[in-house]
Swiss-Prot record:
The active site is at E139. Belongs to the polypeptide deformylase family. One of its GO terms (molecular function) is peptide deformylase activity. It holds the Pfam family Pep_deformylase. GO terms for biological process: co-translational protein modification; translation. Gene3D superfamilies: Peptide deformylase. This is Peptide deformylase-like. InterPro entries: Peptide_deformylase, Peptide_deformylase_sf.
Length: 170
């Protein structure tokens, strides 16, 4: 695309306190929001990752971008909330663009329903399962100030943090 410009923003790295602060709801559906969503997509692809939130780049707003595969493309979720979760649980390996190089199995609901607004400010609902359901839960946790490793046992969490610190030191 001629004239297209990628904007890759710096990622907030664990254990930055900003990752533990609940994000504020978006109230303005404008060009600034669309620019934020585009920057999130560029930053996520460069990381690389399949999901990112505005807090991952230091913006305390409830915005999520997911891109699980090329067929479905990228999707932006503004002010997403889980409105229903299945009783069935699954284990899935998770990680974060804010803590690259480490991952572990996390238990999540197998299916969820979310409500959210699109970039035009239209309310939407979406039912998801498998990887998309895991991503919805993971990213909404992040918007609520819960980093994914908080879902692990203390022993697993401490082991992952030590591994990440060692990797970060080089």
């Amino acid at each position: 695309m001629v004239g297209a410009c990628m904007t890759i923003r710096p990622l907030v790295r664990y254990p930055d306190r900003r990752l533990a602060i609940p994000a504020r709801p978006v109230t303005a559906f404008d060009d600034e929001l669309r620019e934020l969503a585009a920057d999130l997509l560029d930053t996520m692809r460069a990381a690389p990752g399949i999901g990112i939130t505005a807090p991952h780049i230091g913006v305390p707003l409830r915005v999520v971008v997911l891109e699980l595969d090329a067929k479905d493309g990228a999707r932006t979720y503004v002010n997403p909330e889980i409105t229903w979760a299945s009783p069935e649980m699954i284990m899935h390996r998770e990680g974060s663009v804010s803590m690259p190089g480490v991952n572990d199995e996390v238990q999540r609901h197998a299916r969820v329903r979310i409500s959210y607004w699109d970039l035009d400010g239209t309310m939407q609902t979406e039912d998801s399962e498998a990887l998309r359901a895991v991503c919805h839960q993971h990213e909404i946790d992040q918007l609520d100030g819960m980093f994914w490793i908080q879902r692990l046992s203390r022993l697993k969490r401490e082991r992952l943090v030590k591994k990440f610190e060692k990797m970060s030191r080089g």
